[in-house]
Amino acid sequence: MVKGRSNKTLAENRKARHDYFVEEAYEAGIELVGTEVKSIREGKANLKDSYAEIRNGEVFLRNMHVSPYEQGNIFNKDPLRDRKLLLHKMQILKLTAYTTQQGYTLIPLSLYLKNGRVKVNLAVAKGKKNYDKRQDLIEKAAKRDIERELKDRSRY
């Protein structure tokens, strides 16, 4: 039997694109221990309010909640522990340069499986102000109205 090579999304940070301007995205591996992989495969991970930080030349993902695996008993770890992200040295240096600039942060966009391994889509992002969010909502509404008009026009 041939293994599927598709990327299966396990968790997504839906508010990320609403709250941030995404500048650049990177694929990173994640260091997991114990039964965390089984729990993540069941879809019991939450990326809401999580972010990455660089400490001593290493990137760590903070506040990612992974629910304890039900059959894991003593092997379960702390659900909110810091998890190390696996990146190349040049990527870490580039991310360090970005995050030293005012207003930039590292946020996870999604968690997915690639060839049986859990990967994180990590983005360099800048926070949106409230008026930016309102402007985005206005643009979405206008685009929706245009699409509706075009659809109605094509009916007749």
Swiss-Prot record:
GO BP terms, alphabetized: trans-translation
NCBIfam families: PRK05422.1, smpB
Major place of residence: cytoplasm
Any one Gene Ontology cellular component term annotated for this protein: cytosol
One GO molecular-function entry: RNA binding
Family, similarity comment: Belongs to the SmpB family.
Name recorded for this polypeptide: SsrA-binding protein
Function (record text): Required for rescue of stalled ribosomes mediated by trans-translation. Binds to transfer-messenger RNA (tmRNA), required for stable association of tmRNA with ribosomes. tmRNA and SmpB together mimic tRNA shape, replacing the anticodon stem-loop with SmpB. tmRNA is encoded by the ssrA gene; the 2 termini fold to resemble tRNA(Ala) and it encodes a 'tag peptide', a short internal open reading frame. During trans-translation Ala-aminoacylated tmRNA acts like a tRNA, entering the A-site of stalled ribosomes, displacing the stalled mRNA.
Assigned keywords, A-Z: Cytoplasm, RNA-binding
Listed InterPro entries: SmpB, SsrA-bd_prot, SsrA-bd_prot_CS
Subcellular location: Cytoplasm
Matches recorded under Gene3D superfamilies: 2.40.280.10
Any single Pfam family the record assigns to this protein: SmpB
